[in-house]
Amino acid sequence: MGFLRRQLREQFEKKKPEALQADIRMISGCQDVQTSADVSNVSSFQLPDPAGNAGGACTSTLLNVLYKDHQTPEDTMSFVELLNKMRENLEAKGFSQVPQLTASHPIDVNDDFDLVPPAATGTRRALLIGINYVGHEQGVLRGCHNDVKNMVEYIKAVHGFEDENITILMDDGEHTAPTHANMIAAYKKIVALSKADDALFCHFSGHGAKIRDDDRGEEDDGYDETLVPIDYHENGMIRDDDLYDILIKPLVQGVHLVCLMDCCHSGTVLDLPYVYKADGNFTEMEIDENFDFKKLLGKFGIDDFDKFGGEALGKINGDALGKVGKDALGKLNKFFG
């Protein structure tokens, strides 16, 4: 990691907004620019008693890696090893998507991975959403219900989640329908119930999309990343800004949230600042070169961005840092004070 990036990370950690003090980690099936596959036959992933023949490539390969690791409890598996094994499994089956980890804190990716962090000694709660878009003329998926069923079996058998603390939304006619309103309500509920030391797990398997940025004008590429509810035609999609406001911002310090997003364009759907990609170019978590500090600060009512050195704090990418050099660091120090 370059000197300026390291300085930026140190300063950001000192003055990070209170809303990012919770321990938040997200595994996504692909980067923002990529799509995530729906697999018609998951038998090659060798899951124990899979709930069906179809499934999402990300969920299926993650479970494959985790079950194998669980069979040898004497061995440990780091974040790096997890993501690399996922990437290798996906490549072996012909998928080009690159799994990545984003987080609210700069995790040491050589530390042991656990879906429930050891520090999470409180209640274990889970919210799982699987949408096959049953009845739609286009975009019907086959594997999302199976993803949820398989993941529920895993978190119960391996991590001790109890049925009373597991919420499932699926468009199968049996569970609560994953409408826009129901998804928002479910995310709000799991946050409202959470207390320090609790472990939260949120899983989404369905369509993700990129749509034109709303009037906040925050996205560098002009697009928001979204989750696609069953009723998106009538009630719209759930934007990354919405997810941040209802799922990330309200979490209290001491809560441990792990999210699995098995959908297209999911790399930054939670707008978290730190990233590690299993593409061979990362050795540690870095501040995402596409992370927008202006967007983050805007969520906390800091509108006079230029006053605090916006040139250096907009999109922190290599070219920008190279152009402003030492002046950038001065502006960063002035901003974080």
From Swiss-Prot:
Signal peptide: none annotated. Ca(2+) binds at residues 224, 240-241, 271. Disulfide bonds join 202-259. Gene3D superfamilies: 3.40.50.12660. GO terms for molecular function: cysteine-type endopeptidase activity; metal ion binding. Auto-proteolytic cleavage into a large and a small subunit which probably remain associated by non-covalent bonds. The modification Cysteine sulfenic acid (-SOH) is found at residue 202. Residues 1-6, 116-125, 290-337 form a propeptide. Keywords: Autocatalytic cleavage, Calcium, Disulfide bond, Hydrolase, Metal-binding, Oxidation, Protease, Thiol protease, Zymogen. Activated by Ca(2+). Its EC number is 3.4.22.-. GO terms for cellular component: cytoplasm. It is an enzyme of class 3 (hydrolase). One of its GO terms (biological process) is proteolysis. Pfam families: Peptidase_C14. Cysteine protease that cleaves specifically after arginine residues. Belongs to the peptidase C14B family. This is Metacaspase III c. It comes from Phaeodactylum tricornutum (strain CCAP 1055/1).
